[in-house]
């Protein structure tokens, strides 16, 4: 890059960090870090009616959790570019002076149309099978007509006037050459609302220009905004930044843009966090939504992704959200981590108490809970997809004596003679009762098999059922180690009594 790269992630605080917003933030982050540039966090809060409490804080918190940091923003102001919230920038008059410049040039004008008049215009266009567009009714009106409207108490919006038959073009990093004609853009558009707040399309241009933004990476749903923004750049005599419109994330079931109404997919980064997805895995997964490096490899650390990132490998096609791929990827990260690291992260989830499963484990003393988690992870590290499953397993083991097992799975089963089942159970019970504190459970089970002459399914199915309630289980001696010796003996005794009765 010849110029010093400056990119921005500019969310609206109208909700929490959505997977689509996270994708946009992540690609801006990779771009900035790969090209040794500057990442700016800007808050676009002009839509005051839709802003939600803690929306901005949620954005920052979840970006940090993902591993995305920024160089400038509300909490890291550069005096040259601050402030970083559009509401604050509006109070300082940053936008209005450029609005006034366009008014003075005759490129912008005041529109006193009422909502009723605009609705009537749209209905008429619909009846005539015309595409919806503003008909320019207030363009070129005299000062007298404007004063007459104001005398009626009407407050104007300010519209940008498109020249006739003018092409707005740009070379998009992801999509190549893109062109729109001014006659097909819906007519003159509002750049300042009647309450004095600039609209998105105007504020974003002023902000990107005055903050020296060099590259704009954003979702493909913004493509229709880009010609309007280029029109403003041209009218103010400014050079526009380089655009890159990244693929939208689609639901593979509906084959449409992922919607907050799609209940089959977790929508917000905070939800992934509380379900026990690792931030490294989410970062890796999102990086592959609409982009891919050279080769077949899929597991990359953040540092590796920064190194190999090439924006020219951005896809034009939608990115389909593959839940199975995410679960697989998260499982790979779980398998690669140490038991101590996974224990610490699972403990964090429990302390945060964002799920009912996590809240239940908060009643266990921390030292005891830590030991329970370590042993649970040792057993299940190879077969869980997310840490919430570790929490669920841990609770199941902690409350094992409160559960009822269905011993009929083996009782009077023609494949398992009752006397053989009892021989296995009683044999292991005796070894537990008579063994030392450091008894090797794996060796004890082997000795029971040798003593009884029972092996394979005949040996392990009864023990699996006794200790887990299922004939299928991981290494049973590791599960026995999760319980106390007394609990192991009681679980064996319960099944023995069930078979003897």
Swiss-Prot record:
Q: Which UniProt keywords apply?
A: Aminoacyl-tRNA synthetase, ATP-binding, Cytoplasm, Ligase, Nucleotide-binding, Protein biosynthesis
GO cellular-component terms in the record? cytosol
Single GO biological process annotation from the record: glutamyl-tRNA aminoacylation
Q: One Pfam family, short name please?
A: tRNA-synt_1c
Catalysed reactions, as listed in the record = tRNA(Glu) + L-glutamate + ATP = L-glutamyl-tRNA(Glu) + AMP + diphosphate
> Can you list the disulfide-bonded cysteine pairs?
none
Functional description taken from the UniProt entry: Catalyzes the attachment of glutamate to tRNA(Glu) in a two-step reaction: glutamate is first activated by ATP to form Glu-AMP and then transferred to the acceptor end of tRNA(Glu).
Protein name, as recorded: Glutamate--tRNA ligase
- Species this chain originates from: Limosilactobacillus reuteri (strain DSM 20016) (Lactobacillus reuteri)
């Amino acid at each position: 890059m010849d110029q010093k790269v400056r990119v921005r992630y500019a969310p609206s605080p109208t909700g929490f960090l959505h997977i689509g917003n996270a994708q946009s933030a992540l690609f801006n982050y990779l771009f900035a870090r790969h090209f040794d540039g500057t990442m700016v966090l800007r808050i676009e809060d002009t839509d005051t009616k839709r802003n939600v409490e803690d929306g901005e804080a949620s954005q920052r918190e979840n970006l940090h959790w993902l591993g995305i940091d920024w160089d400038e923003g509300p909490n890291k102001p550069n005096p040259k570019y601050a402030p970083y919230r559009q509401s604050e920038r509006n109070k300082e008059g940053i936008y209005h002076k450029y609005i006034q410049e366009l008014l003075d040039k005759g490129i912008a004008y005041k529109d006193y149309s009422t909502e009723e008049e605009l609705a009537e215009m749209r209905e008429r266009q619909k009846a005539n099978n015309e595409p919806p567009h503003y008909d320019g009714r207030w363009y070129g009106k005299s000062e007298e007509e404007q004063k007459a409207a104001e005398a009626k108490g009407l407050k104007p919006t300010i519209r940008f006037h498109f020249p006739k038959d003018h092409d707005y073009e740009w070379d998009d990093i992801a999509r190549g050459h893109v062109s729109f004609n001014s006659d097909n853009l819906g007519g003159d558009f509002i750049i300042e609302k009647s309450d004095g707040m600039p609209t998105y399309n105007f504020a974003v241009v002023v902000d990107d220009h005055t903050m020296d933004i060099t590259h704009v990476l954003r979702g493909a749903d913004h493509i229709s905004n880009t010609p309007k923004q280029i029109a403003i750049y041209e009218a103010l005599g400014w050079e526009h930044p380089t655009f890159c419109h990244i693929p939208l994330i689609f639901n593979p079931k509906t084959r449409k843009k992922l919607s907050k109404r799609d209940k089959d997919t977790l929508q917000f980064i905070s939800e992934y966090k509380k379900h026990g997805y690792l931030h490294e895995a989410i970062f890796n997964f999102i990086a592959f939504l609409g982009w891919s490096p050279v080769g077949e490899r899929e597991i990359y650390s953040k540092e590796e992704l920064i190194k190999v990132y090439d924006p020219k490998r951005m896809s034009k096609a939608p990115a389909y959200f593959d839940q199975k791929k995410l679960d697989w990827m998260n499982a790979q990260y779980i398998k690669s981590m140490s038991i101590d690291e996974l224990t610490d992260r699972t403990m964090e989830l429990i302390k945060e108490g964002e799920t009912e499963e996590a809240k239940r484990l908060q009643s266990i003393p921390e030292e005891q809970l830590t030991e329970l988690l370590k042993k649970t992870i040792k057993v299940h590290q190879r077969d869980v997809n997310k840490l919430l499953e570790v929490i669920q397993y841990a609770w199941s083991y902690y409350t094992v004596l409160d559960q009822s097992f269905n011993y009929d799975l083996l009782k009077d089963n023609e494949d398992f003679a009752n006397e053989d089942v009892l021989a296995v159970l009683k044999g292991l019970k005796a070894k537990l009762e008579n063994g030392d504190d450091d008894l090797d459970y794996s060796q004890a089970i082997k000795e029971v098999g040798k003593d009884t002459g029972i092996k394979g399914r005949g040996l392990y199915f009864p023990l699996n059922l006794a200790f887990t309630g299922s004939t299928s289980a991981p290494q049973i001696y590791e599960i026995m180690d999760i319980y106390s010796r007394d609990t192991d003996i009681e679980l064996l005794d319960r099944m023995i009594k069930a078979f003897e009765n």
